[in-house]
Amino acid sequence: MEGQQVLIFSASRRTDIPAFFGGWFLERLRRGDLAARNPVNSRQITHFRFDPAAVDCIVFWTKNPAPFMSCLDEIDGMGYKYYFQFTVTPYGNDIEQNIDKGNIIDTFIRLSERIGADRLIWRYDPVIINDRYPIGFHVDRFCSMAEQFCGYTEKCVISFIDRYQFLSDAMRRHDITELSPLQIESFMGQICRTLDTLPSKITLSACCEKTDLAAYGVQRNACVDGELIARIRGVQKKYRKDPSQRPGCGCVQSRDIGTYNTCRHNCVYCYAGRGKKKTACNEDSPLLCDTVDTVNDTVKLVDLRQGA
């Protein structure tokens, strides 16, 4: 196994594939053929050919997996291993503009019952505050959700809003401010007391936080989690840390196959949607909402099929 390429698909940090592009993704798995642009140099494309044996795991990121649930039986039947990161937050359509929260709790529970609590990670991410969403609001809603999700997940990932430069205007329009250390301390202290009372443990992890949360038993998170992937696969294996992620990130190496500016949720805090929206998706194309320009693109083929 030493030196063999590891293929973990991240689907995706850049868009919500389960909510909007499940048909495209399922078709790519059927064909064993998928491509992604380099986000730094958009003219560089990596084109993967693979079979289930070549893919260690698929990490799904979503705010609404309901449209994708019908795909899971076929994905299981093909032999792919996967887990979900499911963001459930208490914001209204002022912040998360196109998310219907009416059945979100039921969807979380149904997905957990389908795949298991160990393969469903709850993300309360990010925590943002303004006059409508003060710290007390977050404490109440987090604790209520934690009680409802108890037994249906084993882990919750939290993060606090980062002031990306290109988000400054959106943050000002909604009077969003970064949390002070005292506000973070207040939030963490109260939610940890609730978690300690739950009959089934939910472990807290934090994503690349500057504030030290170790006093609250908060672990450094790995969204693309090598230890979890090894457990799901039933193997003893160490995965390499991803050098392309932010300092403090615990993720192992993966290939993100999403495309920026394709998510339709239109969350005001999102770092992945800062250009003209691409919504047309061709299931015959290995690229999401995109096609290969045979004149200007450089394509690197990576063939990981058995016997290739």
Give the label of every model feature segment.
Residues 153-260, 285:
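Catalytic cores of enzyme domains
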Residues 90-98, 126-136, 171-180:
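Surface-exposed cleft-lining segments at the edges of enzyme active sites
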Residues 1-95, 101-117, 277-308:
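Conserved Radical SAM active-site core
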Residues 213-215, 264-268, 278, 296-297:
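Short active-site-adjacent structural elements
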Residues 247, 255-276:
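Local cysteine-cluster metal-coordination motifs and their immediate loop/turn environment
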Residues 103-169, 190-208:
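Conserved C-terminal portion of the radical SAM core fold
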Residues 14-16, 63-65, 87-91, 125-127, ...:
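Active-site beta-loop-alpha junctions enriched in small/polar residues
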